[in-house]
Design a protein with these regions (language model features):
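Non-heme Fe(II)/2-oxoglutarate
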Residues: 2-88, 109
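Catalytic core of Fe(II)/2-oxoglutarate
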Residues: 157-209
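Solvent-exposed residues in well-ordered beta-strands and their adjoining turns
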Residues: 20-22, 104, 125-127, 201-205
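Short hydrophobic/aromatic beta-strand or adjacent loop that forms the aromatic wall/cage
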Residues: 14-16, 121, 195
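Short helix-to-loop capping/linker segments positioned immediately adjacent to catalytic or ligand/cofactor-binding
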Residues: 62-65, 85-89, 108-112, 130-133, ...
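Catalytic core of non-heme Fe(II) oxygenases with the double-stranded beta-helix
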Residues: 95-175
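A short beta-turn/loop motif at secondary-structure boundaries
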Residues: 91-94, 190-192
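Short clusters of hydrophobic/aromatic residues that line enzyme substrate/ligand-binding pockets
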Residues: 53, 142, 186
Length: 209
């Protein structure tokens, strides 16, 4: 029996955005100085972080110049990504943001988690030190877990339907952006230097009339 050529469509794709801030080195140096001062004064929070320092969720309200500058950059980057993904978004919707600092010393990591209640989640990379062991390419990498269910093959056979993962280790000055439902975790920092990132969530709200 003859049949037509199969017509394949991809459904339920997950957008993943990478943006690099141009000439970020000077901004990152100022951020590191401001963050160090905050660490001396603030005890930090316990969230998905293991052994690291997690600031309050107040990035977008901070008075420090570099914090404020980065907050503005994040607003613009999230807005640009949203416009590209959803150009016909209703005009009465606006994005509200929250953000925080993560400082991860040696062996610190972030346990698997997602960010319910938001639309976008993201991370900006301030300092990404190399592992003390040059052969360790996973130090401080962020790993995303395929949100789809998978066929129960017990890991014996890789197929397009097998639950997968995506791992990336961005350079300093890079911002990653993904849908907040996407579960992820951060590999342990295997460097003697602190790894420093800025994480954030963005959600929609109706603009006041």
């Amino acid at each position: 029996m003859a049949f037509d050529e199969p017509q394949v469509r991809v459904i339920f794709p997950v957008p993943f955005v990478t943006i690099r801030i141009q000439a970020a080195e000077e901004l990152n140096e100022r951020l590191l100085g401001e963050i160090a001062k905050r660490q001396d004064k603030e005890p930090g929070l316990d969230r998905s972080n293991r052994y690291g320092w997690h600031s309050a969720l107040d990035l977008f309200d901070r008075p420090e110049p570099a914090h404020s500058e980065l907050a503005g950059e994040i607003r613009e980057m999230v807005g640009a990504a949203t416009a590209k993904l959803a150009p016909d978004l209703p005009s009465d919707l606006e994005l509200v943001h929250e953000g925080w600092i993560n400082v991860s010393p040696t062996n610190a990591m972030n346990a698997p988690h997602d960010h319910p209640g938001s639309f976008w989640s993201g991370t900006y990379y301030v300092r990404v030190p190399e592992a003390d062991d040059a052969d360790d390419s996973q130090s401080g990498a962020i790993e995303f877990i395929d949100p789809r269910g998978s066929i129960g093959l017990g890991g014996k056979l890789e197929t397009p339907f097998t639950r997968g993962k995506f791992t990336v280790r961005p350079a300093a000055g890079t911002c990653l952006l993904w849908p907040s439902f996407l579960r992820h975790w951060v590999h342990p920092n295997r460097s003697s230097q602190d790894r420093v990132t800025v994480a954030f969530n963005s959600r929609f709200t109706r603009a006041a009339k």
